[in-house]
Amino acid sequence: MSCNVVVGGFFGDEGKGKIVAYLALKDRPAIVARGGVGPNAGHTVIVDGKKYSLRMIPSGFLNSECRLLIGPGVSVDPGVLAMEIEITGVDSRLGIDPHCPVIEKRHIEQENISEHLKAKLGSTGSGSGACVAERALRTVKTAKDVPELAKYMADVPSEVNEALDKGMGVLVEGTQGTYLSLYHGTYPYCTSKDVCASAICSDVGLGPTRVSDVTLVLKSFVTRVGEGPLPGQLSRDEVLRRGWMEYGTVTGRERRAAPFDFNLARRAVMLNGATQIALTKIDLISPEASGVRSYEELPVKAKEFIERIEGETMRPVTLIGTGPSTFDMIDRRHRE
């Protein structure tokens, strides 16, 4: 089977959690592995009316048969992790690489007393950045040093590669978005490491030739939480009028919003080597699309928007989110 890497194409909050949850349930991969920075970013999953907001556990946990892995590139907060294990009930299916750096209370305190991080850059204050910085100095504690994590220890790179060798499916979940990348984003208004597809693969121990697809998640409008530039930013009143007001999963802060940006989308396709696009929340720019699960039933306005995205990016829009639930989705991956 294949290896599909899911990453964000804007500033995070594109709906990666929904896409990963759908793919985990639809494609039934053997493994869902999480890359990214750490608990500084949250993914929201809604199924059967129940909402899960996750910062550590892979969003594919809804597939009760898959193995859930956290790669060595991800910083782990044991407290956040324990809470999410209890909420999701995945204790027996979870594996954490022993090389994951561990976020300690002092990391969180360092970020929360930093005026530069909190006030100027809009950090979430999760301790992830301080942990990553200490890892670069080679002084950070790792998961193998934490007794309460001992039973979860797993050689994540070996597991994901061996699964692929056996013909099993692997789904890799990225976090945040292309323009929050430390290398390719709006520095210094960015996260503490690269979060593009190549980095997410490295986070879980996958070489580039193991990847079958890179699914770039784009929302039908652009949002950004915290500080930093947002091209085409709308006034708060206009955001409310359009029904685009959202709130950060981790911080609860209002997200600023702007119309879909084709320039950003094209560059994100290039930077991530995207093979396909997943478009979310089309129902918020075309209300008649709400809940639709067939492309033919979409209103003309929505189809024209999708066709323009495909034309401008030269990539197919294969998944289209039409509502908040995981299965509010049009799946065009196997169309003739």
Regions found by a protein language model. Name each.
Residues M1-E336:
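Non-transmembrane, aqueous-exposed alpha-helical and coiled segments at domain scale
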